[in-house]
Amino acid sequence: MPFIAFNKAFDPAAPDDLRINTAAVLYVEASRPDLIGQTTIHLLGQGVVVNAVTESIGLVVSEIGDLVAATRHYLAPPPAEGASTVYICPANVSYVRPNLPALPDFWVVRFVDGSELRVVAPLPLGL
């Protein structure tokens, strides 16, 4: 279980490291414009608490590795900037089920800690 470090985003900015166990990552996504940091990291057991870091989504995804890209599904209309891409760690997925006959089709990804995420159909390779 390798640990990797990122710069935690604070308001106001402060130099600090966030060291994460890559085996504990559920998914990552680019931070919304109204949040601090460039990337948001969701970890096992944290519920709605997230970790915002200053590094770009591309760097975070490449550092963690073995993530599967999917488009997030929103029950409400997507944000003005469009639907976000989430990068999911398949090792921490309990199961994936379709939410049919909903239109547009989407999948519910259930993680081993009981949290869930909805992604747009079709389901990406690797899940």
Task: Go through each PLM region and give its residues.
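Acidic, Ser/Thr- and proline-rich intrinsically disordered linker/docking segments
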Residues: 1-127
